[in-house]
Amino acid sequence: MADYLSVTQLTKYLKLKFDRDPYLERVYLTGQVSNFRKRPNHQYFSLKDEGAVIQATMWAGAYKKLGFDLEEGMKLNVVGRIQLYEPNGSYSIIIEKAEPDGIGALALQFEQLRQKLAGEGFFDERHKQALPQFVTKVGVVTSPSGAVIRDIITTISRRFPGVSILLFPTKVQGEGAAQEVAANIARANQREDLDLLIVGRGGGSIEDLWAFNEEIVVQAIFESRLPVISSVGHETDTTLADFVADRRAATPTAAAELATPITKTDIVSWIAEQQNRSYQACLRYIRQGQERVDKLSYSVMFRQPERLYDAYSQRLDRLTTSLMTTFKETLSEAKQEHLILEHRLASVNVQARLERYQDRLATAHRLLIANMTNQYDSKLAGFERAQAALLSLDTSRIIARGYALLKKDGAVAACVKDIKKGDHLSIVMRDGQLEVEVEDVNEKNI
């Protein structure tokens, strides 16, 4: 009689086979991403082709190492192991590595990041800075031992020997290179003596140049206060640093030429040209002046110089005559006014009028004093009457004379009709207060 297996037994047996099969421990598989929805950590989706579908799992650690984003419909080449899930008997592939089919992972990562940064405006022309025409000090972020810095020094020294170069020694490839490039760009921007910044390295593979495609480097160049020239790789190489930089140079030599657009020779030629222009302008000015002198020397004014001031002399004579006439008329009018005033003063008895005013002032003073005294006495008497009335209403004075004050609920009780049997009253006396309860109320007319 045949032995029957339980479903669990069969599933465990199959899982054991899966786990021990060397061909299933490392599987190379090609398929199209399906049912993908990005999750915060682990990723779960399907890989399919025309004839079949397999479930796929990528743990968070493996997904972070991808370098590009998975997308629905993307065709992948993956490496992983096959695993059987016992509860439902399904199998799936645990993906350890993946790259796009037909295109390198770095190329895809480059394109995805380029589109993202372009959408955020990092490469817009409106953010580009103009390069200065004259520089005194140039910063260079590159390797201290490569040909890049030698080419830059040689070119700038040849074109404009007075320009200083400040090197920021930088790791330009490998782990940590992007962070070092970004940090040195930030350091350069902290200096006040730099006019320009060159960021670059020599040629290499896409992996060698990858530090200049990292978002941290793009961000540092974008935020740079100093204008930035990018010179990464050869002429055919293009990095994201080239897109965001203010200018891109195909070679280090070209970068140095962009940094010094005007050479020492250009300045010497310009100075010579300006000297020649100044010399020619001086000659023209001297010739024109000589022509004017010659013209004036033959004029009537130079041959008869007294004619230059004849008109001014005549005008001075007229003004002198007019001034003397005006002065005499003004003096005559002043004398007449003086005589009139003397006549008026003589007709007025000033002393008598002054005495009358003094008498009137003394009388007014006496009346004012008397009036003020009467008002003061009247006001004082009124005040004393009001004070006496107020003192007569002072309860403390009344109580001091032997009377008592009756209060109900804190208020003065003045009438029997306001009090009823059982009320609690306070009797305020000269030396204290009594608390009493009313036992009976008798209303009597007094």
From Swiss-Prot:
GO biological process per UniProt: DNA catabolic process
Protein keywords: Cytoplasm, Exonuclease, Hydrolase, Nuclease
Reactions catalysed, as given in the entry: Exonucleolytic cleavage in either 5'- to 3'- or 3'- to 5'-direction to yield nucleoside 5'-phosphates
Keyword Hydrolase assigned: yes
A molecular function (GO) term: nucleic acid binding
E.C. numbers: 3.1.11.6
Top class in the EC scheme: hydrolase
Cellular component GO terms, alphabetical: cytoplasm; exodeoxyribonuclease VII complex
InterPro entries per UniProt: Exonuc_VII_L (IPR003753), Exonuc_VII_lsu_C (IPR020579), OB-fold_nuc-bd_dom (IPR025824)
Primary localization: cytoplasm
Subunit structure: Heterooligomer composed of large and small subunits.
Family: Belongs to the XseA family.
Known role: Bidirectionally degrades single-stranded DNA into large acid-insoluble oligonucleotides, which are then degraded further into small acid-soluble oligonucleotides.
Protein name stated in the entry: Exodeoxyribonuclease 7 large subunit
Species per Swiss-Prot/TrEMBL record: Streptococcus equi subsp. zooepidemicus (strain MGCS10565)
Higher taxonomy: Bacteria, Bacillati, Bacillota, Bacilli, Lactobacillales
Gene (name only): xseA
